[in-house]
UniProtKB/Swiss-Prot annotation:
It comes from Annulohypoxylon moriforme (Filamentous fungus). Keywords: FAD, Flavoprotein, Glycoprotein, Oxidoreductase, Signal. The gene is mfmG. The keyword Metal-binding does not apply. The lineage of its organism: Eukaryota, Fungi, Dikarya, Ascomycota, Pezizomycotina. It comes from the Eukaryota. The active site is at H538 (proton acceptor). The keyword S-adenosyl-L-methionine does not apply. This is Glucose-methanol-choline family oxidoreductase mfmG. Oxidoreductase; part of the gene cluster that mediates the biosynthesis of the phthalide-terpenoid hybrid 11'-O-desmethylfendlerol. MfmG seems not to be involved directly in the biosynthesis of 11'-O-desmethylfendlerol and its role has still to be determined. The biosynthesis of 11'-O-desmethylfendlerol begins with the NR-PKS mfmB that forms 3,5-dimethylorsellinic acid (DMOA), which is then transformed into the phthalide 5,7-dihydroxy-4-(hydroxymethyl)-6-methylphthalide by the cytochrome P450 monooxygenase mfmA and the hydrolase mfmC. Its cofactor is FAD.
Length: 604
C-alpha cells in the first residue's frame, strides 16, 4: 500500500519518552515442553486465542513468536498513532520484509509486502482502523461455509468482545468534526481500546464535504453492519493516553502473569509434527537450537496469510504436486493450501491545500506536538493520519462502461458490499517520495487513496523449498482481473470528482499535484494506475474456510484442517474471502474470539 513516510518523524523518535521494555524479561526460553495448546504466531489472532484459552487456569498454552515486543526494537515509536505510516519498507527487525514475485498486472515488477514480525503482529504497525463488515457479507460467509453462526446477528457478540469504547473527546476535536455513531453498536470491557482520535485533521473536515458533494450519504462510523457512505473513522487508540491499542497491549499484557501462559519469543516454527493423521506438536528453533513443543490437545496456526500455508506445505499438507517437487512426504493432499489469495488495491492522488496538514509537521511544530503527546496524549501525534473514510458501490454512469464479465462478477456480491473506498491522508503521496516532503516543497498537502474493496483478482502463496528459512513465494496477482481495472479507474475518477468539487474549492491551491493535470484520458489514467497501484497488505484466504465439498477449502467452519486431527488455522488466511470494511483487522480479532469459544467447547 502507499503510505506516508515523514522523514521528520523518523528523526524525532529520540525526543519521545521511551516505553519500558522490561516485559521482555518475563519471556520464556524455548526448550522441549508439553502444553495443552501450542499457538504458532503471536499476532492479531494468536494473542486473542492465548488470552481466552488461559482464562481456564487448568489449561496450559504456549505462543511461538519469531519477533518480540516492538518496544524492544524501536522504543515506543509503534505506540504513537501518527508514526503508523513510517513502518512499511523501513527494513526494521519489526517486519519480515517480504517481496512479491513479479506482478503481471504491474508490468512484471515485484512489490514490497509488509507483514509484522512482533508480538501483536500487524496490529503493532497498521493504521488502527476499526470497523465491522457488512450484514450481507456475513450472510455470504455463513452460506459459503454452511454455518449460520457466521451471520451478522450471531457475530455481534464477538465484535463487542473486541471493543472497549470511549466516546470522542469533544474538547480537543474540531467543532465540525463530531462523529456520528449509535451507542447500541459500541461496548466496553473488550480487548481493544477504541475511540476517535483526540485530534481531528482539518483536511478531513473538507474531504467530508467533497464526499457529500458527489453523493455519498453520512454513515454511522461503520460499526452497525452498514458500509455505504462516509464517516469519521473509529480507531484502536486509548483515549486517555493517545497510545495505540494493539493485540499485545490489549490481549497479552493484561494476562502476562498467568502461570499457565508461556510466551516463546525469538522462536521460529520449522515443521508440524504428526502422529499418523493427527498433529501432535511443532518443531521450533531458537538461538540456533532445535526443540519440540508437544500439544496434548491442539496445535493452532496463527502465523498469518503467508506463513500459515507455508508451514502447512513444508510439513506435508498442501498440493501434492508441489510437495513432491521438494521431496516433502505427503501427510494430506489439500490443493487449496496457499490458493485463493486476495487483497485490496489502491492508488493515491495529492493536492496542495490551504489548511494545515502533517506535511509541514517539522521543526518547532513537531517539537510542540511531541510535548503535547507526551504530556496529554493529544495533538497531531494522537491522530493516525487516516481518520476519515468513504465507501460506495460504483455509480450507474460508471457501471454502464464495465465489461460484461465485471458486471457478472460484481452481481454475485451482496447488495450492501461496497466496491470502492476512499481514505484521507494529510500529506503528499507520490511514486518517488511517500509523504512528509511538505517542508521541502513548501506548503501543505493533502491526499486521498482511491481503492478497490471488491477485488476479483486471485493470487497464491507457494514455497521455494522444504524449509521455513526460505521466504514464501508471494503472488497476489493484483490488477489482473478486468473487474479490478474497471473499478480502480472508477475510484480514481470519483476521488477527482470529490477533490475538484465546488465544496472543496475554498482550500485547493493550483492544479492537482500528483499524478497531475496531464493525466486525463482513460488511457493516461490506466497507465498511471498500472505504474502506481499497490496492494493494501490486506492479504486473506490462503487457508480458505469452506464446506467439505469445496475443493479449495482447507479448513471447516471451526477452523479445523480437513483430514488432520488436532490442527486448526485461525488468522487472516482462514477466511473464505476478504470482507469489505474500513480495514480487515477487526474481522481477524472477531474470528479469533469466536473460535476461542469453539476450542473451549471442544471435547477431547
Amino acid at each position: 500500500m502507499y503510505m506516508l513516510r515523514p522523514s521528520s518523524l523518523l528523526l524525532a523518535t529520540g525526543l519521545l519518552n521511551q516505553g519500558s521494555s522490561v516485559l521482555a524479561a518475563v519471556i520464556s526460553r524455548a526448550s522441549n515442553q508439553t502444553f495443552d495448546y501450542v499457538i504458532v504466531g503471536g499476532g492479531t489472532a494468536g494473542l486473542v486465542l492465548a488470552n481466552r484459552l488461559t482464562e481456564d487456569s487448568s489449561v496450559t498454552v504456549a505462543v511461538v513468536e519469531a519477533g518480540t515486543f516492538p518496544e524492544d526494537v524501536v522504543g515506543n515509536v509503534t505506540q504513537v498513532p501518527a508514526y503508523a505510516p513510517q513502518f512499511e519498507g523501513a527494513e526494521l527487525d519489526l517486519e519480515w520484509n517480504f517481496t512479491t514475485t513479479p506482478q503481471a498486472g504491474l508490468g512484471n515488477i515485484p512489490v514490497s509486502y509488509y507483514r509484522a514480525k512482533a508480538l501483536g503482529g500487524c496490529s503493532d504497525i497498521n493504521f488502527m482502523a476499526y470497523g465491522r463488515t457488512s450484514k450481507g457479507a456475513h450472510q455470504l460467509w455463513a452460506d459459503l461455509v454452511g454455518d449460520d453462526s457466521y451471520t451478522y446477528d450471531n457475530m455481534v457478540k464477538y465484535y463487542k468482545k473486541t471493543m472497549n469504547f470511549s466516546p470522542p473527546n469533544a474538547e480537543t476535536r474540531l467543532a465540525n468534526a463530531t462523529p456520528m455513531y449509535d451507542t447500541v453498536d459500541t461496548s466496553t470491557g473488550g480487548g481493544i481500546d477504541v475511540t476517535f482520535p483526540s485530534f481531528a485533521q482539518s483536511w478531513s473536515t473538507w474531504v467530508s464535504k467533497g464526499l457529500a458533494a458527489i453523493g455519498l450519504p453520512q454513515a454511522h462510523s461503520f460499526v452497525d453492519g452498514n458500509l455505504l457512505g462516509h464517516s469519521w473513522q473509529m480507531v484502536g487508540i486509548t483515549q486517555s493516553t493517545g497510545i495505540r491499542s494493539s493485540a499485545q497491549a490489549g490481549y497479552l499484557r493484561p494476562v502476562m502473569s498467568r502461570p499457565n501462559l508461556t510466551i516463546l519469543n525469538g522462536t521460529f516454527a520449522e515443521r508440524i509434527i504428526f502422529n499418523g493423521d493427527a498433529a501432535s506438536g511443532v518443531e521450533v528453533t531458537a538461538k540456533g537450537q532445535t526443540y519440540t513443543l508437544t500439544s496434548k490437545k491442539e496445535l493452532i496456526l496463527s502465523a498469518g496469510v503467508f506463513q500459515s500455508p507455508q508451514l502447512l506445505m513444508v510439513s506435508g499438507v498442501g498440493p501434492k504436486a508441489l510437495l513432491d517437487k521438494f521431496n516433502i512426504p505427503v501427510v494430506k493432499d489439500l490443493p487449496g493450501v496457499g490458493q485463493n489469495m486476495v487483497d485490496h488495491i489502491t492508488v493515491p492522488l495529492s493536492y496542495q491545500v490551504d489548511v494545515v496538514t502533517s506535511s509541514t509537521l517539522a521543526g518547532s511544530s513537531l517539537e510542540e506536538a511531541i510535548t503535547e503527546w507526551n504530556t496529554h496524549g493529544t495533538g497531531p501525534l494522537s491522530n493516525n493520519g487516516g481518520d476519515y473514510i468513504g465507501m460506495e458501490k460504483a455509480p450507474a454512469e460508471f457501471r454502464a462502461n464495465f465489461s460484461a464479465e465485471t458486471v457478472k462478477q460484481l452481481s454475485a456480491l451482496p447488495e450492501d458490499w461496497p466496491e470502492l473506498q476512499y481514505n484521507v491522508l494529510p500529506a503528499t503521496v507520490s511514486s518517488t517520495s511517500i509523504g512528509g516532503e511538505g517542508s521541502v516543497l513548501g506548503g501543505n498537502y493533502g491526499s486521498m487513496l482511491a481503492s478497490v474493496i471488491a477485488p476479483q483478482s486471485r493470487g497464491n502463496v507457494s514455497i521455494a523449498s522444504a524449509s521455513m528459512s526460505d521466504a514464501p513465494l508471494i503472488n497476489p496477482n493484483i490488477f489482473t482481473a478486468q473487474a479490478d481495472i474497471d473499478l480502480l479507474l472508477t475510484a480514481f475518477k470519483r476521488v477527482r470528482q470529490a477533490l475538484q468539487s465546488s465544496a472543496m474549492a475554498p482550500i485547493m491551491i493550483g492544479d492537482e499535484f500528483f499524478p497531475g493535470p496531464t493525466v486525463q484520458t482513460d488511457e493516461q489514467i490506466l497507465d498511471y494506475l498500472t505504474e502506481t497501484v499497490r496492494p493494501f497488505s490486506h492479504g486473506f484466504a490462503t487457508c480458505k474456510m469452506g464446506k467439505s465439498s469445496d475443493p479449495d477449502a482447507v479448513i471447516d467452519s471451526h477452523g479445523k484442517v480437513y483430514g488432520i486431527k488436532n490442527l486448526r488455522v485461525v488468522d487472516a488466511s482462514s477466511f473464505p474471502f476478504l470482507p469489505p470494511g474500513p480495514a480487515p483487522q477487526i474481522q481477524v480479532y472477531t474470528l479469533a474470539e469466536k473460535l476461542a469459544d469453539d476450542i473451549k467447547q471442544t471435547k477431547y
